[in-house]
């Protein structure tokens, strides 16, 4: 019986060398980190600058508070975003991209271009394309 590798439809016969040698496929690693509903869109919003939970919820219609909180925690755990808590009453929490998170910008730009091409329509104005956004 052929071995089927987790997270893929690959069998031993057609497997990528990464799987055969026990190495982690870099593409699979990124997919594992970002393959959750809303994660990419949260990052898109954080490229516009530091955001509070309410601002993110407003920008992501359909995303529940519970789901957003879970995604933010996952991204923070992986070092992609910062969570800054300010000692105020009521407490203020703001999220921003880490240096590691900012490395994702070229990928998001490529996704934006591909999506625009596939939609065959004029794309939205996006600060990702102009290089604007957080430093």
Curated annotation (Swiss-Prot):
GO cellular component: protein-DNA complex
One GO term (biological process): regulation of DNA-templated transcription
Domain HTH hxlR-type residues, every copy: 25-123
Keyword Transcription: yes
Keywords, comma-separated and alphabetical: DNA-binding, Transcription, Transcription regulation
UniProt xrefs under PROSITE patterns: HTH_HXLR
Bilayer-crossing regions: none
UniProt GO molecular function: DNA binding; DNA-binding transcription factor activity
Designated name of the protein: Uncharacterized HTH-type transcriptional regulator sll1512
Lineage: Bacteria, Bacillati, Cyanobacteriota, Cyanophyceae, Synechococcales
